Design a protein with these regions (language model features):
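Flexible hinge/capping segments at coil-to-helix
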Residues: 127, 138-155, 169-170
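A bilobed periplasmic-binding-protein/Venus flytrap-type ligand-binding module shared by bacterial periplasmic
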Residues: 1-4, 134-146, 209
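Short Pro/Gly-enriched coil loops immediately N-terminal to beta-strands
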Residues: 123-137, 149, 184
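Ligand-binding "clamshell"
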Residues: 117-132, 172-174, 209-210
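Extracytoplasmic small-molecule ligand-binding "clamshell" domains
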Residues: 1, 16, 21, 42-121, ...
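Ligand-binding clefts/hinges and TM-proximal coupling segments of bilobed small-molecule sensing domains
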Residues: 5-43, 161-183
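Conserved functional loop/turn residues at catalytic and ligand-binding sites
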Residues: 106, 154, 195
């Protein structure tokens, strides 16, 4: 249900958090004051919801040294919890395994960074709440300045959505190989070390890493 987000959008809370963590307001959720009043049955207070989140996607969601989670999604989830009178438990999942995690009962819902690449027939998807594109990033001193110059080269990605973006652009047939990395920090470390020639990332977080 997105009524909670629509109410928070009307309050300006989502825009505030987006600007705080991403430097820009990327939100696209409809604003609807008093949206929760439209529910036929009001939420039962005291419920615990297990949310599947990605780790290593700073500043969207990433674990801290003490084991807690920080970032845009945890802060927004806390605001939703306050609206509903619920508590949340975060479960780290791989974004490519959302349907399996939901089907097994390990999580009640998944809150991803920006996009979902699986079949929409196996899960119920909410409308997008962040405007996002994928970007191809190279080192500042790289000699690769055009897409065509990456022919036969190594591209680093972190998940299937980045691979889908690569395929949509037609570059998957041109590059030499595509390597998966655990998270964006590992992806950029590989780029800096020269282990890959470019990386594909969500545009909403590109400013954080560059």
């Amino acid at each position: 249900n997105t009524l909670e987000l629509k109410e928070l959008s009307a309050d300006g809370q989502i825009s505030r958090l987006s600007a705080q963590y991403l430097g820009t307001d990327y939100t696209c959720m409809e604003a609807l004051p008093g949206a929760l009043q439209l529910l036929e049955t009001q939420p039962e207070p005291g419920r615990k919801l297990r949310i599947g989140v990605q780790d290593g996607i700073a500043p969207i969601s990433s674990s801290r040294d003490d084991g807690s989670f920080g970032g845009l999604i945890p802060d927004l989830a806390q605001l939703v919890a306050e609206k509903l009178g619920w508590t949340f438990e975060y479960m780290v999942i791989n974004s490519d395994n959302v349907a399996a995690e939901l089907g097994s009962g390990n999580i009640d819902c998944a809150w991803m960074a920006a996009s979902f690449s699986g079949s929409s027939s196996s899960v119920s998807l909410s409308p997008g709440w962040l405007r996002n594109t994928h970007e191809l990033v190279v080192r500042s001193d790289s000699r690769y300045t055009r897409k065509n110059s990456l022919k036969g080269k190594v591209i680093g990605i972190t998940d299937a959505t980045a691979l889908a973006a690569l395929k949509e652009s037609g570059m998957d047939a041109k590059v030499g190989s595509v390597w998966y990395y655990d998270d964006l920090s590992a992806c950029f470390a590989a780029l800096a070390a020269g282990d890959c020639d470019a990386v594909v990332i969500d545009g909403i977080v590109s400013g954080y890493y560059m």
